[in-house]
């Protein structure tokens, strides 16, 4: 079948030359009809007989005539082939570049017809939350990179409008704690539950059904206004212990010299041993950082007595006698290979790294867990991570929380839900550069998409990301299908953005005037390549404008989203101070039970009420 189609195509392409060749057989017939003893006489006679030969539209089938037709048709085909082969390639109007701004038609395939099911990007552009659209080529991940200098509206023009969509679970980094205060009541109210037709669902009484959010908060500015977060509660295996230790070391400082790999590895051994013992052997109520601190405080080392055993040594000796292949024992034995002086230095470094846990409030807030990080993909939840934008002393807790969050949700998606969480989880990481390093983030952003998780990094400059993640920063940026520039003047960001936008071809003309005995004028037209927006133009971009780049689509120069136009704006504290969320009242109204607290449970029958 394929061969027949190829022959048909070949015949169609060469049909004009075949017809011309058949018509040219008449010239062969005219030559044969011409009278003359030699070629010159035949040429003179050809003029007389040619009109008669051409009167017939039917080709001559005489062998000589067919040869003439074949030569004429073949010669023309050869001439056309040679001309096309050597032809110059012109791209009129695109000689120096084809860059242009995107239009409504460019973004249309990526927008969901139901407004609430979109990620808001700009005033006129949005991206569907559907990770499996009808046309697979329009599928894009929901990772977003937002770059904007101080005061460019990263929170007001982008983060808050997306929080108002209320189509997913949210993890929001909240510098200063203002986002929770302004949007908390809106989330408590929730959004109407939408049916398959995109319309709000109603109960049997005709009332609209709302889906209120569970609200969780970790406040590192004021621990009295925070729920409890215990990283130990999410340890389920030996690899979880190593992940926790890696995050702790990456975001805290010890006493070893910067970049000294020995001290880092030695501390890792000790932390793994102690946390392993706490996880596998200690009661649930003692599985926290307070117990870890007590262990380190009890580890006395005597440089002049290598045989001395402190209480922790005795505990591990007893564990080894009972379980010689225990994970904690194997790690502790490696740590004990260090000589007395070295071991003392390791303990000093550990003490310095965990010095913040000498603060009673921090020990109390990490005593047990209320955040339930592994349930964020089960039902709509909003987790606010409040951190200081001036003091990074406790930001390691935020980084630790994100690390455990990503790992827990990915594992739950794979083990429980067949690879995809029932509720999409969006991480809106404002002031991303201030929370510290999330280990293996470059790998996480590449793999979380398929689990219905997305990460949105909000930065003041692109160089901030490179300062933290070094060479991996480009990999992280490459896995962000969407990037938005809200304005700024950081040179590296402007240079890279101008290069990515590309060049367009413009028309220019030059005028000249020469004076002498006679005055003459000249006018010269030419084409040049110009950057779609140069660095200086980006630096002075209008404060109400932003630049959107979506993978595979032309860039957009658009207006920033007007938060007051959102349907849910009226439920926020920005619209009415009465909508302000009271964190203290919210936390005090909740029943909080500690792990060792005893209470009575009653079952109430409301059927007869």
Predicted regions: what they are:
Residues 14, 22-29, 140-453, 468, ...:
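P-loop NTPase motor domains
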Residues 39-43, 54, 107, 198-206, ...:
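Extended hydrophobic/Leu-rich segments
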Residues 77, 103-110, 117, 123-136, ...:
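A broad, low-specificity signal for short, low-complexity segments enriched in glycine/proline
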Residues 99-101, 126, 142-143, 330, ...:
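General secondary-structure edge motif
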């Amino acid at each position: 079948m394929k061969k027949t189609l190829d022959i048909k195509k070949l015949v169609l392409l060469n049909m004009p030359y075949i017809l011309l060749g058949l018509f040219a057989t008449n010239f062969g017939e005219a030559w044969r009809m011409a009278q003359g003893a030699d070629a010159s006489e035949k040429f003179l006679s050809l003029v007389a007989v040619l009109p008669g030969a051409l009167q017939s539209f039917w080709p001559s089938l005489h062998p000589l005539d067919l040869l003439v037709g074949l030569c004429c048709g073949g010669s023309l085909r050869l001439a056309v082939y040679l001309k096309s082969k050597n032809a110059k390639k012109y791209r009129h109007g695109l000689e120096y570049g084809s860059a242009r701004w995107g239009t409504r038609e460019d973004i249309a395939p990526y927008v969901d017809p139901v407004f609430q099911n979109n990620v808001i990007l700009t005033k006129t552009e949005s991206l569907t939350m559907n990770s499996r659209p009808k046309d697979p080529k329009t599928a894009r991940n929901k990772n977003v990179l937002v770059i904007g200098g101080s005061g460019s509206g990263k929170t007001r023009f982008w983060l808050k409008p997306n929080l108002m969509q209320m189509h997913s679970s949210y993890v929001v980094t909240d510098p200063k704690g203002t986002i929770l205060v302004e949007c908390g009541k809106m989330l408590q109210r929730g959004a109407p539950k939408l049916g398959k037709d995109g319309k709000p669902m109603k109960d049997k009484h005709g009332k609209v059904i709302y889906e209120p959010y569970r609200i969780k908060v970790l406040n590192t500015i004021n621990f009295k206004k925070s729920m409890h977060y215990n990283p130990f509660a999410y340890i389920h295996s030996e690899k979880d212990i190593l992940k926790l230790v890696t995050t702790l070391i990456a975001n805290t400082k010890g006493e070893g010299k910067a970049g000294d790999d020995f001290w880092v590895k030695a501390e890792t051994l000790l932390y793994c041993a102690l946390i392993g013992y706490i996880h596998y052997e200690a009661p649930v109520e003692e599985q926290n950082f307070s117990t870890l601190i007590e262990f380190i405080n009890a580890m006395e080392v005597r440089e002049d007595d290598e045989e001395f055993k402190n209480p922790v040594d005795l505990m591990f000796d007893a564990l080894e006698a009972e379980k010689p292949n225990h994970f904690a024992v194997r790690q502790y034995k490696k740590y004990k290979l260090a000589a007395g002086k070295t071991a003392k230095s390791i303990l000093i470094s550990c003490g310095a790294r965990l010095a913040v846990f000498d603060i009673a409030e921090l020990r109390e807030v990490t005593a047990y867990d209320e955040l339930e990080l592994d349930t964020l993909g089960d039902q709509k939840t909003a987790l606010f991570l409040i951190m200081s934008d001036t003091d990074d002393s406790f930001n390691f807790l935020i980084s630790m929380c994100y690390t455990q969050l990503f790992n827990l949700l990915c594992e739950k998606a794979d083990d429980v839900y067949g690879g995809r969480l029932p509720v999409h989880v969006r991480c809106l990481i404002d002031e991303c550069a201030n929370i510290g390093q999330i280990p293996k983030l470059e790998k996480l952003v590449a793999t979380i998409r398929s689990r219905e998780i997305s990460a949105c990094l909000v930065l003041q400059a692109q160089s901030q990301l490179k300062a933290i993640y070094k060479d991996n920063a480009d990999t992280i940026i490459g896995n962000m299908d969407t990037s938005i520039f809200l304005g700024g003047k950081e040179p590296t960001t402007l240079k890279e953005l101008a290069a990515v936008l590309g060049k367009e071809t413009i028309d220019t003309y030059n005028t000249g005037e020469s004076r002498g005995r006679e005055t003459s004028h000249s006018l010269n037209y030419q084409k040049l390549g110009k950057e779609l927006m140069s660095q200086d133009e980006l630096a002075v971009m209008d404060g109400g404008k932003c630049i959107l780049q979506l993978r595979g689509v032309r860039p957009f120069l658009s207006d920033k989203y007007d938060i007051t136009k959102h349907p849910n704006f009226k439920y926020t504290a920005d619209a009415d101070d009465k909508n302000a969320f009271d964190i203290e009242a919210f936390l005090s109204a909740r029943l909080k039970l500690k792990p060792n607290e005893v209470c009575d449970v009653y079952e109430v029958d409301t059927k007869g009420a």
